[in-house]
From Swiss-Prot:
Binds heparin. It comes from Homo sapiens (Human). This is Laminin subunit gamma-2. One of its GO terms (molecular function) is heparin binding. Laminin is a complex glycoprotein, consisting of three different polypeptide chains (alpha, beta, gamma), which are bound to each other by disulfide bonds into a cross-shaped molecule comprising one long and three short arms with globules at each end. Gamma-2 is a subunit of laminin-5 (laminin-332 or epiligrin/kalinin/nicein). The large variant is expressed only in specific epithelial cells of embryonic and neonatal tissues. In 17-week old embryo the small variant is found in cerebral cortex, lung, and distal tubes of kidney, but not in epithelia except for distal tubuli. Residues 1-21 form the signal peptide. Keywords: Basement membrane, Cell adhesion, Coiled coil, Disulfide bond, Epidermolysis bullosa, Extracellular matrix, Glycoprotein, Heparin-binding, Laminin EGF-like domain, Proteoglycan, Repeat, Secreted, Signal. GO terms for cellular component: cell cortex; collagen-containing extracellular matrix; extracellular region; extracellular space; laminin-2 complex; perinuclear region of cytoplasm.
Length: 1193
C-alpha cells in the first residue's frame, strides 16, 4: 500500500506545476479577478491551498486577487479598485485607506494631501512650511481661534473669539473649536441664560446604521408619502430602492435618528450613497429635516454638478445654520435648535428619474450621552438665573411655574401664585399642600375622564380603549392614555409594545389583542424589534435559525431549531463545496452529492466515472499492477524468502521509470497542445479585432456616402427651386410681352426693351448650365464613393473568408447591405429628380424658343436694334444644356445598373463569409471542448490528491483529539472524590451556621424593640437612643438579609445533597468546627440576653426619672441631686455596657457575613467544576475509546 500511495503522488505531482483556472472556484479561487493561476508547493504547505492567481484584473493583487494594488483602494470587498491619486509631494506614500484618504506629511491636509494647513505654505517634497509670522514670539496665536495669519504682531480672531492670543470665547459663547467658522458656539440654554461652559459629563456617541443584518428600521416612500419597496443586499450589506417612474423615492430614517437630537447641534450627519442609471442632477430637496413645524432641505452636491454614476461616495452635512452648510431656508440659531429638539423626519433622496436605483450605507449621526468616554465638548452646561434649573435651564425652580405651558422649556418661569406662598407644579401651575389657586377652579374628574385645558371646570371622556385613565400633556395639550394593559402601548393604547404583536383597535383588519411574539427562544430577549408588531413575524432570528417564527434552520444548516439547548440547535452542514450540490444538506446533515461523489459530506469520489475517463482508468490499472508486482518483489527480498535476481528488479524499475517518463511526456504534450491552442485562440481574437476595425471603416465610408447623398439631395432641391423661379420669370415675361402694344416703325423708340429681355434669357440659360455642372460633379462624387465602399466590402469579406479564423459580425455586414440598399434607393430618387429637372429645363427651353419666335415675327423691328447674334448664342447654350442633362441621365442609369451588380456580388460574398464562419465556429467549439475536458481531468486529479491529504490530516488530528479528551476525562474522574468532599463540607457548615444564627436574629429583633421603647421615654437622651436604634436596625437588616441568603443557599444545597447522600458518613470529621460555631453562637445569645437585661434596667431607671419629672412640687434639692445621679448612672450604663454589646453584635454579624461569602465562593467553584465535568462528558465520543487501526499493513 505505501508503494501505491507513492505512485499516485508521483502521477499527480507531475501534472500540478501549471494549471489554468476552471469553473471550480474551490481549486483556483481568484475572486472573479483572474482566469489563470499556478500551483505553489510552498504556499500549499503553509495554507493548505497551493493555487496562486496570475494576471489579476481591476487593479487587484494578492494570492487570490483579494486586495488592491499599491496606490489603489475600494470601499467594499467586491467593488472595483480605484486610484488613490495621492499627491507625490504631500503624501507619505502612494497608499490610502478604504475611503480614499491619503497619509499626509507634516503641515499638509486634504483627502489627496494636495494643500497646506492654515498657517503653512509652500508645498514641497518635505511637506508644507509653517508661516514664520505665526512662529514669532510676539504673535503666539491659538490656531483654533484665528481667522488668518497675524497682522503686525496682532492675532486676527474669529467672530466669536477674543483675547490677545484668540484663545477665549466671547461672552455668551463656549467650546473653542478650530473646525467652527465662528470659532465658538453660542450658548443655547433655551434662551434663559447667556452664560455656559462645556459639560464634562457627556461623551461622544454615534448613532449608526450599517445594515449588517437587515434594513435596521429604514423605509422607502414616494414623494407623496406612499410606501415604496426597500431591499437589503446581503452581499454588500446595504439597502437600496428603485424607481419605475419619474417621481423620486426617499429613504426614511428610523426612530433612533429622531426625537430630541439637541446634543447633535454643530455635529455631522454622514452616509455612503451611490446612484445607478437615471438622471443624476442633484436637487434642492435631496436631504430633508423636519420638526417643530419647521422644514429645511439641502442638495447632495452643488446644483451645477452631476452625481457620479455607480460610484459610492461619502456625503457629510453639518447640523447648524451657517450659510456654508447650504440648508434652505436659512433658519435662525434658536429655530435650528428648536427643530433638532423635536426632529420628526429625516429623509434622503434615493432615486433620480425613471428606472433609477439608489444605494445607501454607513449612516452616522454624531451625538453625545451622559456616560464616561471620549469627551463631547460641544454639549453645554448652563449657569441658570433665579427661577430656573437643569443642565440647559430647561426646568422651573421650586416656587416657579411656566407662564405658557405651550412653549415647554422655551417658556418663561414666573413665581407661583398660591395662598400662603406655597409651592406649585412647575408645568401646570397647580398648587400643592392644600393651597389652591384663587383664580382657577378645576373639576374633580372621575377615572376615565380628564379636565379640559380650555375649560378646567368641565370633564371630558378619555379617548382610550376599555375606559383607561388619561392625562393631558402640558406642552402640547395632547391627551395620553395611562395604565395600558400589559403588552399595549401608544398614546391611545392602540399599539402593541415591543415583543408583542396584534391589532388592539382593528385598524388593519379584525381586532386582535396583543400577545407575546412566538419566536421559539431564538431571538435575543435584550434586543428591541425582535418581531413585527402587527403580524408577529420574527425579524432577528439567532442560533442560525430562520422562518416566520424562527422555527427553521437557515440555508446551509441543519438540526433541531426548537431544541432547548442552543448548542443542539442548527449546525453548519459542512458539505464539501466541490462535491456537493449548492442546495445545502438534508435534515439529518447528510449532503446532496454531485454525480461522481459520495460520502456523508460528498468528500469521496464515487467508483463510477464518466465514459471519457475510461482510457485514464485503464492506464492507471496497468500502473497499479506493475506497482503491485514491484511491491511483491520488494517484500520477498526483505523477508528473505528467496533471492530476487537483480536483473529482474532492474528491469522492473526501468519499466516503472519508462512509464513515468511516458506520463511526463504525455503531460508535456498536453501542455504544448494547450499552449498552441491558446496561441491559435489569441490569433483568432486578433484577426477578429482586425476584421472588426475594417468593418468600422466600412461603416464610416457608408456614412460618408450617405452624407454626400444628402448633399446631392440638397443641391437637387436648389436646382428645382431655380427652375421654378425661371419658369415664373418666363411666365411674367410672356405675359408682359403679350400685353405689349408694338407701335409702327415710325413710332419705334429704341431697342432697349428687347435687349433687356435677351439679357434675362441669357441669365436663365447660364443658371441652367451651372445647375447641370453641379449635378454632374455630385454624380461623379457619388459614383466614386460607391466604388470605394464596394471595394472595402470585397476586401473585408475576402480576408475574413480566406483566413478561416474568427467569425465575421453578421449583424454588421447585414447592416452594411441595408445601407447599400438605402444608397441605391437614394440614387434612384436622384435619377427621378434629375429627369424631372431635365423636363423642366426642356420646357423652359421651348418656352424661350416661343418667345424668340414671337420676337422674330414682330414687324418694324430693326436687326440692328435686336442683337440676333446674342439670341443665337443663348440658343446654343440651351442646346448644350439639354445635351448635358441627357448625358448625365445616361451616367445615372449606368450607375444604377452597376449598383445592382455590386449588390448581388456583395450578397454572394456575404454568403461565403457566413459559411466560412460556421466552419470556423465548429472548429473552435471542438478545440474548446477538448481543452475543457483536459482541464477538467487535470483539476479532478488535483482535487483527488488534496482530498486524500486532507482526509489523512483530519484522521491524525482526530486521533490526537481523542487522546486529549481521554486524558481530560481521566483527570476529571480523579477530581470527583475531592469535589464531593468539598461539597459535603460546605453543606454541613452551612446548616450549622444557619441553626446558630437563627437565635441571633431573634435576639437582635428584641434588642431593636427595646431600643425603640427607650426612644419614646426620654427626650433628653433622644440623640443617644436614636443612634442605638439605628445600629439595631442595621444589625437586624443584616441578619434578615443573611437569613434570606441562607434560605436560597439551603434550597440549592438540597439538590446537591440528593446526589451526594453516600457522603454523609464523612461529615463527622467537621464536628469540632461545628461545635465551635455553636459555642460562639451561644456566647452571642448570652450577650444578647445580658443586653436585654441592661436595656430593661435602663428603662426602669428612665421610668423613675420620668415619674420624678411629672411631680416637680414634691422634689427638693436632695431629690434633684438624686435625679442627676440616676441620670448620670443611666448614661454611664448605656455607654459602658449597652454600646459595647451592640458593637460586638455588629462585629459578629460582619464575621458571619464573611463566612457566608467564603461559602458562596467555594460553592461557585464547585458548581463550575461540575459544569466542566458535564461538558467533558458531553464531548466524549460514544462507544469504546480504543478504536481500531485505519489500515492493516
Amino acid at each position: 500500500m505505501p508503494a501505491l500511495w507513492l505512485g499516485c503522488c508521483l502521477c499527480f505531482s507531475l501534472l500540478l506545476p501549471a494549471a489554468r483556472a476552471t469553473s471550480r472556484r474551490e481549486v483556483c479561487d481568484c475572486n472573479g479577478k483572474s482566469r489563470q493561476c499556478i500551483f505553489d508547493r510552498e504556499l500549499h504547505r503553509q495554507t493548505g491551498n497551493g493555487f496562486r492567481c496570475l494576471n489579476c484584473n481591476d487593479n487587484t493583487d494578492g494570492i487570490h486577487c483579494e486586495k488592491c494594488k499599491n496606490g489603489f483602494y475600494r470601499h467594499r470587498e467586491r467593488d472595483r479598485c480605484l486610484p488613490c491619486n495621492c499627491n507625490s509631494k504631500g503624501s507619505l506614500s502612494a497608499r490610502c485607506d478604504n475611503s480614499g484618504r491619503c497619509s499626509c506629511k507634516p503641515g499638509v491636509t486634504g483627502a489627496r494631501c494636495d494643500r497646506c494647513l492654515p498657517g503653512f505654505h509652500m508645498l514641497t517634497d518635505a511637506g508644507c512650511t509653517q508661516d514664520q509670522r505665526l512662529l514669532d514670539s510676539k504673535c503666539d496665536c491659538d490656531p483654533a481661534g484665528i481667522a488668518g495669519p497675524c497682522d503686525a504682531g496682532r492675532c486676527v480672531c474669529k467672530p466669536a473669539v477674543t483675547g490677545e492670543r484668540c484663545d477665549r470665547c466671547r461672552s455668551g459663547y463656549y467650546n473653542l473649536d478650530g473646525g467652527n467658522p465662528e470659532g465658538c458656539t453660542q450658548c443655547f440654554c433655551y434662551g434663559h441664560s447667556a452664560s455656559c461652559r462645556s459639560s464634562a459629563e457627556y461623551s461622544v456617541h454615534k448613532i449608526t446604521s450599517t445594515f449588517h443584518q437587515d434594513v435596521d428600521g429604514w423605509k422607502a416612500v414616494q414623494r407623496n408619502g406612499s410606501p415604496a419597496k426597500l431591499q437589503w443586499s446581503q452581499r454588500h450589506q446595504d439597502v437600496f430602492s428603485s424607481a419605475q417612474r419619474l417621481d423620486p423615492v426617499y429613504f426614511v430614517a428610523p426612530a433612533k435618528f429622531l426625537g430630541n437630537q439637541q446634543v447633535s447641534y454643530g455635529q455631522s450627519l454622514s452616509f455612503d450613497y451611490r446612484v445607478d442609471r437615471g438622471g443624476r442632477h442633484p436637487s434642492a430637496h435631496d436631504v430633508i429635516l423636519e420638526g417643530a413645524g419647521l422644514r429645511i432641505t439641502a442638495p447632495l452636491m452643488p446644483l451645477g454638478k452631476t452625481l457620479p454614476c455607480g460610484l459610492t461616495k461619502t456625503y457629510t452635512f453639518r447640523l447648524n445654520e451657517h450659510p456654508s452648510n447650504n440648508w434652505s431656508p436659512q433658519l435662525s440659531y434658536f429655530e435650528y435648535r428648536r427643530l433638532l429638539r423635536n426632529l420628526t423626519a429625516l429623509r434622503i433622496r434615493a432615486t433620480y428619474g425613471e428606472y433609477s436605483t439608489g444605494y445607501i450605507d454607513n449612516v452616522t449621526l454624531i451625538s453625545a450621552r451622559p456616560v464616561s468616554g471620549a469627551p463631547a465638548p460641544w454639549v453645554e452646561q448652563c449657569i441658570c438665573p433665579v427661577g430656573y434649573k437643569g443642565q440647559f435651564c430647561q426646568d422651573c425652580a421650586s416656587g416657579y411655574k411656566r407662564d405658557s405651558a405651550r412653549l415647554g422649556p422655551f417658556g418663561t418661569c414666573i413665581p407661583c401664585n398660591c395662598q400662603g406662598g406655597g409651592a406649585c407644579d412647575p408645568d401646570t401651575g397647580d398648587c400643592y399642600s392644600g393651597d389652591e389657586n384663587p383664580d382657577i377652579e378645576c373639576a374633580d374628574c372621575p377615572i376615565g375622564f380628564y379636565n379640559d385645558p380650555h375649560d378646567p371646570r368641565s370633564c371630558k371622556p378619555c379617548p382610550c380603549h376599555n375606559g383607561f385613565s388619561c392625562s393631558v400633556m402640558p406642552e402640547t395639550e395632547e391627551v395620553v392614555c395611562n395604565n395600558c394593559p400589559p403588552g399595549v402601548t401608544g398614546a391611545r393604547c392602540e399599539l402593541c409594545a415591543d415583543g408583542y404583536f396584534g391589532d388592539p383597535f382593528g385598524e388593519h383588519g379584525p381586532v386582535r389583542p396583543c400577545q407575546p411574539c412566538q419566536c421559539n427562544n431564538n431571538v435575543d430577549p435584550s434586543a428591541s424589534g425582535n418581531c413585527d408588531r402587527l403580524t408577529g413575524r420574527c425579524l432577528k432570528c439567532i442560533h442560525n435559525t430562520a422562518g416566520i417564527y424562527c422555527d427553521q434552520c437557515k440555508a446551509g444548516y441543519f438540526g433541531d431549531p426548537l431544541a432547548p439547548n442552543p448548542a443542539d440547535k442548527c449546525r453548519a452542514c459542512n458539505c464539501n463545496p466541490m462535491g456537493s450540490e449548492p442546495v445545502g444538506c438534508r435534515s439529518d446533515g447528510t449532503c446532496v452529492c454531485k454525480p461522481g461523489f459520495g460520502g456523508p459530506n460528498c468528500e469521496h469520489g464515487a467508483f463510477s466515472c464518466p465514459a471519457c475517463y475510461n482510457q485514464v482508468k485503464i492506464q492507471m490499472d496497468q500502473f497499479m499492477q506493475q506497482l503491485q508486482r514491484m511491491e511483491a518483489l520488494i517484500s520477498k527480498a526483505q523477508g528473505g524468502d528467496g533471492v530476487v535476481p537483480d536483473t529482474e528488479l532492474e528491469g522492473r524499475m526501468q519499466q516503472a521509470e519508462q512509464a513515468l517518463q511516458d506520463i511526463l511526456r504525455d503531460a508535456q504534450i498536453s501542455e504544448g497542445a494547450s499552449r498552441s491552442l491558446g496561441l491559435q485562440l489569441a490569433k483568432v481574437r486578433s484577426q477578429e479585432n482586425s476584421y472588426q476595425s475594417r468593418l468600422d471603416d466600412l461603416k464610416m465610408t457608408v456614412e460618408r456616402v450617405r452624407a454626400l447623398g444628402s448633399q446631392y439631395q440638397n443641391r437637387v432641391r436648389d436646382t428645382h427651386r431655380l427652375i421654378t423661379q425661371m419658369q415664373l420669370s418666363l411666365a411674367e415675361s410672356e405675359a408682359s410681352l403679350g400685353n405689349t402694344n408694338i407701335p409702327a416703325s415710325d413710332h419705334y423708340v429704341g431697342p432697349n426693351g428687347f435687349k433687356s429681355l435677351a439679357q434675362e434669357a441669357t441669365r436663365l440659360a447660364e443658371s441652367h448650365v451651372e445647375s447641370a455642372s453641379n449635378m454632374e460633379q455630385l454624380t461623379r462624387e457619388t459614383e466614386d464613393y460607391s466604388k470605394q465602399a464596394l471595394s472595402l466590402v470585397r476586401k473585408a469579406l475576402h480576408e475574413g473568408v480566406g483566413s478561416g479564423s474568427g467569425s465575421p459580425d453578421g449583424a454588421v455586414v447585414q447592416g452594411l447591405v441595408e445601407k447599400l440598399e438605402k444608397t441605391k434607393s437614394l440614387a434612384q430618387q436622384l435619377t427621378r429628380e434629375a429627369t424631372q429637372a431635365e423636363i423642366e429645363a426642356d420646357r423652359s427651353y421651348q418656352h424661350s424658343l416661343r418667345l424668340l419666335d414671337s420676337v422674330s415675327r414682330l414687324q418694324g423691328v430693326s436687326d440692328q436694334s435686336f442683337q440676333v447674334e446674342e439670341a443665337k448664342r443663348i440658343k446654343q447654350k440651351a442646346d448644350s444644356l439639354s445635351s448635358l442633362v441627357t448625358r448625365h441621365m445616361d451616367e445615372f442609369k449606368r450607375t444604377q445598373k452597376n449598383l445592382g451588380n455590386w449588390k448581388e456580388e456583395a450578397q454572394q460574398l456575404l454568403q461565403n463569409g457566413k459559411s466560412g464562419r460556421e466552419k470556423s465556429d465548429q472548429l473552435l467549439s471542438r478545440a474548446n471542448l477538448a481543452k475543457s475536458r483536459a482541464q477538467e481531468a487535470l483539476s479532478m486529479g488535483n482535487a483527488t490528491f488534496y482530498e486524500v491529504e486532507s482526509i489523512l490530516k483530519n484522521l491524525r488530528e482526530f486521533d490526537l483529539q481523542v487522546d486529549n479528551r481521554k486524558a481530560e476525562a481521566e483527570e476529571a474522574m480523579k477530581r470527583l472524590s475531592y469535589i464531593s468532599q468539598k461539597v459535603s463540607d460546605a453543606s454541613d457548615k452551612t446548616q450549622q451556621a444557619e441553626r446558630a444564627l437563627g437565635s441571633a436574629a431573634a435576639d437582635a429583633q428584641r434588642a431593636k424593640n427595646g431600643a425603640g421603647e427607650a426612644l419614646e421615654i426620654s427626650s433628653e437622651i433622644e440623640q443617644e437612643i436614636g443612634s442605638l436604634n439605628l445600629e439595631a436596625n442595621v444589625t437586624a437588616d443584616g441578619a434578615l438579609a443573611m437569613e434570606k441568603g441562607l434560605a436560597s443557599l439551603k434550597s440549592e444545597m438540597r439538590e446537591v445533597e440528593g446526589e451526594l447522600e453516600r457522603k454523609e458518613l464523612e461529615f463527622d470529621t467537621n464536628m469540632d468546627a461545628v461545635q465551635m460555631v455553636i459555642t460562639e453562637a451561644q456566647k452571642v445569645d448570652t450577650r444578647a440576653k445580658n443586653a436585654g437585661v441592661t436595656i430593661q434596667d435602663t428603662l426602669n431607671t428612665l421610668d423613675g426619672l420620668l415619674h420624678l419629672m411629672d411631680q416637680p412640687l414634691s422634689v427638693d434639692e436632695e431629690g434633684l441631686v438624686l435625679l442627676e445621679q440616676k441620670l448620670s448612672r443611666a448614661k454611664t450604663q448605656i455607654n459602658s455596657q449597652l454600646r459595647p454589646m451592640m458593637s460586638e453584635l455588629e462585629e459578629r454579624a460582619r464575621q458571619q457575613r464573611g463566612h457566608l461569602h467564603l461559602l458562596e465562593t467555594s460553592i461557585d467553584g464547585i458548581l463550575a467544576d461540575v459544569k466542566n465535568l458535564e461538558n467533558i462528558r458531553d464531548n466524549l465520543p460514544p462507544g469504546c475509546y480504543n478504536t481500531q487501526a485505519l489500515e492493516q499493513q
